[in-house]
Structures are given as structure tokens and as C-alpha cells.
Swiss-Prot record:
Keyword Transcription regulation: yes
Regulation: Activity is triggered by phenol binding.
PROSITE patterns, alphabetized: SIGMA54_INTERACT_1, SIGMA54_INTERACT_2, SIGMA54_INTERACT_3, SIGMA54_INTERACT_4
Disulfide bonds: none
Protein name: Phenol regulator MopR
Length: 560
């Protein structure tokens, strides 16, 4: 292939550990928490022999072709994920130099050393040609160890990685073929890569990138099994599906058990819990699980209605009752006749409205504002508050007799931080909704984003989770993964808050102990090095200084 005049040409041997510091800086060993990270993707450090055992077991179960396809597809996904990270690291380099992050990552991962014979690429002209030697291929070694000499190339995962990485970077399907392989007796492995359309056997090559029919069969069987489960699920299981909330945790099920018992009766229910825990969803569940489900469900947020209008909003008004009342109209209770009324933030009711509500609960009757005629309605009341009603009674803000009437069946909705097992379910639930709403298909959350969400305390509970996921869906491009920054732009500040609070030093105590500033600096540096497992780049990031500065100070400590 003769490159076009303006096609970038890159032809030099990749030197081990040269110009890869930007990639190494993305790797974090967090031994304290048992985690290794490459940017936002969680990694594993494992024995290559494990992959050998896996390859052998899959070969015995599925045969050669399906095992090969499995490893190629695994490698393809790994290459795609690395390309997502590395594509943003080198904006000031030319196309070929930036592309080399992929081969460099192959080496950093300990998979293979890449030697460049030839590389031509141009995004504008959609041209690509690559010729690489692979040295020290882990996959060739594994294959020889488990199967002996092969009659065909055996670096399947490495090949998939190259295809996935190059396809992502170039924005078109790039396919590699392994022309030489150590597993079949060659001196080294060698691959050739170019666009799918330039291969004569394109159909055969793309077949290995496509989902295996066995996975389709398994998915079909799983769908059939799920349908059977839906048809025969027990009455006990149905108790947890009657609510419009989402969850499977023990705390969630306890709430469902309580509300299931209340749903079949006429008793007033008081839902208590922090803001955003889903009180209205549970209130709708009570209504849907009762004999009133075919009748109206009316939700009212008492905090949103001015105090001088709350009584007329709830119980209606007669024409001429006050300035602006030009016609008679029903209140919320009349609209909910035969059904359920949900009063959120009930503590915000005015004293007159509280008195009218108490009468409504005790006698089932009320009067419209400006009317003397008594009316009767049949309504089930579900009230909710995020405040302590008992304390509101002590403070004189809420009537004691109304509190006792509402407190017959209190249910406390747990905050999200106490039902963390439900977070993955809620994430899937909201992502499915927002993907449909914004006509996008996303690849879910990055490992680091998932990890952070599971540890976050969620002061805004489910409502906060919902809002963050909607924002992240808008910010994330189609077919991309949601990154932590899209969910929590301030995530670094959030992580630092706890650490800073715990590590503040009492300056007066230091002065009283005649401390040495040099010694304090040395202790801090040593602590950072220990925490980073002696990774200088990571320690420098923790200290907020450059690697060069930390290198200089480490030398001072050593020489001192």
C-alpha cells in the first residue's frame, strides 16, 4: 500500500516504557480497598495460567470455533474500553502517535510487546494499514502450555483487542489477521490490519466478531424461563410487585409487608422518611393494592399551597366566599371520593386546615369554604412527612389530636443509604426510562461510577439518584459509557471531604510540641508513598504536586 500524500506515516519501533507515563498515571493500585483501576475501569491482576485453564475448559465444552470466537470478542471489548480512555489523553500528537497508546497498553498489561513494522492512517481519508510484530505473546505461551503446537494462529484475545481498539479509534470496522504465530512454530507473531472492506474474506472474518449462536440460545431459554416464572410466581412474591417502587432489599420488603397489611383496610397510613425516598410511589402502591384501585388517586403537596388557600384547595369553595371565588368548585377530597388522597408534607397544613382534616377523619364530613352545608365523602387518607411530627406537636406546630389520629399506622421508609442492595436495580430502572426518553442506547456505568454510587450516602435519596442519572444520560454520547464525572462533577471534592475532616492538624498542638517542618514534610511524603504502594506518580497526585517535584523531594530525603 502506498500512502496518500497527506496520510500520516509512522514507522518506528515502540521502545518499552518510552512515552507511556500518561498511561501509567491512569493506573492506580488501591490495595487498601482491594482494587486496581485504569481510569474508571476496574482491573484484575491474575495469573496467565488461569486463562489457560479457561481456554482448555471452554475448548472441551464448546469446541475450537466457539472458544476462538469467545476470546476474540472478549479482547474486542477490552480494546474498545481502552480506546475510550486513551483517545482523550493525547490531543496534541499526530494521529499515528496518538494511536500508539493501544499497542503501548498491550505492553503495560503484560499481554505482548508490540513492534511496529508499518502504520499508515488518516481519519479524513478513512485509510488504515498496520503491520505489527508481536513479541512475548502471553497467549501463544498459554496455548503451547495447554495444547502444544498449533496448526493455526492462537493469539485470539490479542487479535480481538487490536480489532476493538483500532475500530474505536478509526470510527470504522478494522480487522486484523495473524499471519505468523509462535504457537504454530514461527519465530514471532505478526498481524496485519486494515478496513473490513479491503479484506477478500470479509464475511469469514466478521463472523468471529458477531455474537455466538450459543449465547442467543441461552438468552432465548432464559427469556422463556423468566416468562414461566412470571406465570407461576407465588402470591407472596406478588406482595412486592404491587408497589410502584423498585427494590429487593430486606428493608424494602419489610416496608412492603407492612403496607400490604394496611392496603386491604380503611386505616389512615402515615409514611415517614427523608425527602426523596419515594413516599408517593408507596402511597400509589397502597391505593393500587386496595379495593379502591379503580377509583381516583389524588396527590397533594401541602407545602406547595399558600396557607390562606390550603383549606379551599382541600375542601372546596363556594362562589363568593372570598374575592376571586367567581364560581363554586370541588376540593381535592371531593375529587378523591371513593378512592385515596395522598397528603404530602402534611405538617405544613394551617391550623384551620388541620381542624377540618381531623373532622374529616373522625366523621367523614366537611364543609366547603363559604358554605354551611355539610358534605360527606368516602376517602382513604395516606399522609406523609419528612419531619418529626411528634416534635412538631411539642413545638405547637401540629395538633396533638390530629397526630394521634394519623399515627395509627405509621410506616418509616428507609433512606437509600440503608438499602444499598437496591441501587443497581434503581440504576437499571431509571437508565431504561431515560434511554427511551432521549432516544439513546448507553453502555451502562463505568466501574468507578458504579463503585462510587454504591458508597455515596445519597442525602437526596432516590430523587437525587433519578436526577443524576437523567443528567448523565443527557451528557453521555450514544453508545458510550457513563463516566463518574457525568454523574458527579464534584466527585473529587466529595472524596476529599471525609479525608480532610479526619486529617486536620491542630496547629497549636504542633507548636507546643516544637515540631520540625522538614520532618513533617518527610512524614507526609512517606505516608503518601506507603498509601500508593510506592507508586511515585500516584503519590504525587495525592499530594497535589508534580512527579518531578516529588522525585526531587524524595532524593533530598534519601540524601539527608
Amino acid at each position: 500500500m502506498s500512502p496518500a500524500k497527506d496520510v500520516k506515516v509512522y514507522k518506528k519501533i515502540l521502545e518499552q516504557n518510552k512515552d507511556i507515563q500518561d498511561l501509567l498515571d491512569k493506573i492506580v493500585f488501591d490495595a487498601q480497598h482491594g482494587q486496581i483501576w485504569f481510569d474508571e475501569n476496574r482491573m484484575l491482576l491474575m495469573h496467565t495460567s488461569i486463562l489457560g485453564f479457561l481456554r482448555k475448559d471452554l475448548y472441551q465444552m464448546l469446541g475450537l470455533e466457539r472458544t476462538k470466537r469467545f476470546f476474540i470478542r472478549c479482547g474486542y471489548q477490552a480494546g474498545m474500553r481502552d480506546a475510550e480512555v486513551t483517545s482523550k489523553l493525547r490531543p496534541n500528537l499526530n494521529e499515528a502517535e496518538a494511536f500508539m497508546a493501544g499497542p503501548q497498553m498491550h505492553g503495560i498489561r503484560g499481554m505482548v510487546q508490540v513492534e511496529v513494522n508499518e502504520l499508515h492512517l488518516s481519519h479524513d481519508l478513512k485509510q488504515f494499514y498496520a503491520d505489527f510484530n508481536w513479541l512475548n505473546s502471553f497467549e501463544a505461551e498459554v496455548h503451547l502450555s495447554e495444547f502444544g503446537a498449533s496448526d493455526q494462529p492462537a493469539c485470539w484475545m490479542l487479535l480481538g483487542y487490536a480489532c476493538g481498539y483500532s475500530s474505536f479509534v478509526m470510527g470504522q470496522t478494522i480487522i486484523y489477521q495473524e499471519t505468523h504465530c509462535v504457537a504454530q512454530g514461527d519465530e514471532h507473531c505478526r498481524i496485519i490490519g486494515k478496513p473490513l472492506s479491503e479484506w477478500e474474506n470479509a464475511d469469514e472474518l466478521i463472523r468471529f466478531m458477531s455474537p455466538d449462536a450459543v449465547s442467543d440460545e441461552i438468552i432465548a431459554l432464559q427469556a422463556e424461563l423468566n416468562q414461566l416464572k412470571k406465570n407461576i410466581y407465588t402470591e407472596a412474591e406478588s406482595d412486592y410487585t404491587m408497589f410502584n417502587a423498585v427494590g429487593e432489599s430486606v428493608a424494602y420488603r419489610k416496608v412492603c409487608d407492612l403496607l400490604k397489611k394496611a392496603a386491604g383496610s380503611k386505616v389512615a397510613v402515615l409514611l415517614q422518611g427523608e425527602t426523596g425516598v419515594g413516599k408517593e410511589a408507596f402511597a400509589r402502591g397502597i391505593h393500587n393494592g386496595s379495593q379502591r384501585q379503580a377509583q381516583p388517586f389524588v396527590a397533594v403537596n401541602c407545602a406547595c399551597i399558600p396557607p390562606d388557600l390550603i383549606e379551599s384547595e382541600l375542601f372546596g369553595v363556594e362562589k363568593g366566599a372570598f374575592t376571586g371565588a367567581v364560581q363554586s368548585r370541588m376540593g381535592k377530597f371531593e375529587r378523591a371520593h371513593g378512592g385515596t388522597i395522598f397528603l404530602d408534607e402534611v405538617v405544613e397544613l394551617s391550623p384551620r386546615a388541620q381542624a377540618a382534616l381531623l373532622r374529616m377523619l373522625q366523621e367523614g364530613e366537611f364543609e366547603r369554604v363559604g358554605d354551611s352545608r355539610t358534605r360527606q365523602v368516602d376517602v382513604r387518607l395516606v399522609a406523609a412527612t419528612n419531619e418529626d411530627l411528634e416534635q412538631a406537636v411539642k413545638d405547637g406546630k401540629f395538633r396533638a389530636d390530629l397526630y394521634y389520629r394519623l399515627n395509627i399506622f405509621p410506616v418509616i421508609i428507609p433512606p437509600l443509604r440503608e438499602r444499598r442492595e437496591d441501587i443497581p436495580l434503581l440504576i437499571n430502572h431509571f437508565l431504561a426510562r431515560f434511554e427511551n426518553m432521549y432516544n439513546k442506547t448507553l453502555k451502562g456505568l463505568s466501574d468507578k461510577a458504579k463503585n462510587f454510587m454504591m458508597k455515596y450516602d445519597w442525602p437526596g435519596n432516590i430523587r437525587e439518584l433519578e436526577n443524576l442519572l437523567e443528567r448523565a444520560t443527557l451528557l453521555t454520547d450514544h453508545q458510550q459509557e457513563i463516566k463518574l464525572d457525568s454523574l458527579f462533577p464534584q466527585h473529587k471534592d466529595l472524596e476529599a471531604v471525609g479525608e480532610t475532616a479526619q486529617s486536620l492538624i491542630n496547629v497549636e498542638d504542633l507548636f507546643s510540641e516544637n515540631f520540625s517542618l522538614d520532618q513533617l514534610e518527610q512524614n507526609i511524603i512517606r505516608s503518601a508513598m506507603d498509601k500508593s504502594q510506592q507508586n511515585v506518580s500516584e503519590a504525587a497526585r495525592m499530594l497535589g504536586i508534580s512527579r518531578a517535584t516529588l522525585d526531587y523531594r524524595l532524593k533530598k530525603i534519601t540524601l539527608g
